[in-house]
């Protein structure tokens, strides 16, 4: 962080866009078509969009070196430009104009990258085609000058001088935590990220993420703000807390969009944006709308109508998703590349159905009603008691919501310790969303059984959403101790401290014999949950896990 003097926060609006709520502004700025075109200043190609935006791209490495909107420079901080990853090396950079479109093409090894401008628009359309792992390409970052969009949101650490974890989690003087990781949002939740002063808005409108990884519920950094400047990100393949292998091919367009203070036009949003004007530009890997297919389902039965359902399509080459209609489960997933896909139906974030579907370009594949078997939803099993809800998330557990935008040490968090009594009415709210080996392992759950219940063996289930350092639950019931379960496959990076519970949902089952229960029905049985692992360090970086639900089956 810079050593610049602290100053009062100027009023700026924090904007992370939802397709469901964003009000669109005009797609194009005030056109001055006569000025649309480009020049060569020797080091850069200089593009005037014919509206209020002029941008420059380096002829040497394809960096975006300037973004001037209404006469103000927005690009760059700390001597750095906007680019793929931390910048490409010496590249082949060319420019062409075709009518009302200018295309800049960048080739660096096997990676191809593109910037496009349209006459009269204050937008830069961007594509990135990563062919293999020879070029690291986890993100595109738009770097923004310091002081233009000052704010004190969870992903802004301008006013958080104390480093508390790694080099990317910070604390303010009051203890509140800040980090670039604290976006609060899943991919499915947002269409754009950015800031506005009220008179100028700068955003990155995300692509459809067909070549990204992690699915609709993936969480990652989306932007940051520090004393040095700010950054807006399009995630290409971010390895932090990642559950899938990297996909290759063309991702985009994602759009760098300027407005007069409002939110970006919904015409730029993923699923809405049309780019027929790019069909003949020769972009490597580009597949026009006519070469794509659609998957539609007439309905989904067996749903719990208290939850939202999402239908995902995925293979090694691409990923897509769409929301199921609340009334009948109808869904439509358009713009799909041809191929065979695994189709997954999610209740919340919990997979409750999988199938397969083949997509052909230019056609719609219509599926008959999908029936979710009752046994696929763990919530349908009869239980003596249950804590949490089987939806694939820690929603409702203590501190669950806060942990998507704060560190566990944040003073706003309730105590991570404390035991739970079944029948108290506050079981879920009292149960911590996360348990770490070095913080609150050994949590106790008290419950009574009837004589008939105590006379039989029962299955205890613990559902988790991710784990850090192979943390997994070992249970003790009164004097009976379970075996240590094998760790399921989970991301190897930080998760619980960087705003994400999203890993691989897994259910541990424990067969508790009848001999484990107390025979005196007036006494409480005691369930102890310990996190075990041979990995991790201390405190919040000790081995840990995040909970979905736990129950004792009848």
Residue ranges: model-predicted function:
Residues 1-9, 18-27:
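N-terminal secretory signal peptides
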Residues 329, 339-349:
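A short, solvent-exposed beta-strand micro-motif common in secreted/extracellular proteins
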């Amino acid at each position: 962080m810079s050593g610049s003097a602290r100053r009062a926060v100027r009023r700026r609006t924090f904007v992370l866009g939802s397709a469901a709520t964003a009000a669109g502004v005009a797609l194009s700025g005030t056109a001055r078509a006569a000025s649309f075109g480009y020049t060569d200043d020797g080091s850069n190609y200089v593009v005037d969009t014919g509206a209020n935006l002029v941008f420059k791209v380096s002829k040497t490495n394809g960096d975006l070196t300037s973004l001037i909107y209404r006469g103000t420079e927005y690009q760059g901080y700390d001597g750095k430009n906007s680019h793929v990853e931390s910048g490409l090396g010496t590249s082949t950079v060319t420019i062409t104009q075709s009518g009302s479109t200018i295309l800049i093409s960048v080739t660096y090894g096997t990676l191809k990258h593109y910037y496009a401008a349209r006459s009269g628009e204050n937008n830069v359309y961007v594509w990135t085609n990563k062919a293999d792992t020879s070029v690291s390409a986890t993100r595109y970052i738009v770097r923004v000058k310091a002081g233009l969009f000052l704010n004190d949101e969870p992903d802004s650490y301008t006013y958080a001088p104390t480093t508390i974890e790694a080099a990317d989690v910070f604390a303010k003087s009051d203890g509140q935590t800040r980090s670039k990781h604290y976006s609060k949002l899943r991919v499915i939740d947002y269409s754009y990220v950015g800031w506005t002063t009220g008179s100028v808005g700068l955003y990155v409108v995300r692509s459809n993420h067909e070549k990204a990884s992690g699915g609709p519920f993936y969480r990652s950094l989306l932007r940051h703000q520090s004393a040095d400047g700010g950054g807006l990100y399009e995630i290409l393949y971010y390895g932090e807390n990642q559950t899938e292998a990297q996909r290759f091919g063309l991702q985009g367009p994602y759009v760098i969009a300027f407005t007069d203070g409002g939110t970006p036009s919904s015409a730029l949003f993923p699923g809405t944006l049309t780019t027929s004007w790019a069909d003949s530009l020769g972009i490597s890997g580009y597949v026009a709308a006519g070469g794509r297919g659609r998957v539609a389902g007439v309905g989904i039965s067996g749903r719990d109508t208290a939850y939202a359902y999402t239908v995902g399509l995925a293979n090694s080459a691409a990923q897509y998703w769409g929301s199921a209609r609340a009334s009948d489960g109808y869904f439509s997933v358009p713009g799909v590349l041809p191929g065979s896909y695994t189709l997954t139906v999610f209740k919340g974030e919990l997979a409750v159905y999988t199938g397969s579907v083949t997509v052909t370009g230019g056609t719609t594949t219509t599926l008959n009603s999908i029936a979710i078997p009752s046994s696929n939803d763990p919530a349908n099993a009869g239980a003596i008691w249950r804590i949490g809800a089987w939806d694939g998330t820690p929603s409702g557990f203590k501190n669950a919501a806060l942990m998507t935008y704060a560190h566990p040490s944040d003073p706003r968090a309730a105590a991570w310790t404390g035991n739970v009594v079944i029948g108290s009415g506050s079981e879920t709210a009292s149960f911590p969303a996360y348990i770490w080996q070095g913080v609150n392992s050994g949590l106790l759950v008290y419950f009574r059984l009837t004589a008939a219940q105590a006379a039989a063996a029962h299955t205890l289930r613990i559902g988790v959403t991710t784990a850090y350092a192979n943390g997994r639950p070992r249970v003790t019931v009164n004097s009976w101790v379970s075996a240590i379960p094998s760790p399921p496959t989970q991301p190897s990076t930080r998760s619980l401290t960087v705003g994400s519970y999203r890993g691989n949902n897994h259910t541990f089952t424990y067969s508790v014999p009848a001999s484990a229960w107390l025979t005196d029905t007036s006494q409480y049985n005691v369930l102890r949950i310990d996190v075990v692992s041979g990995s991790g360090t201390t405190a919040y970086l000790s081995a840990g896990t995040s909970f979905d639900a736990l129950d004792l089956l009848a």
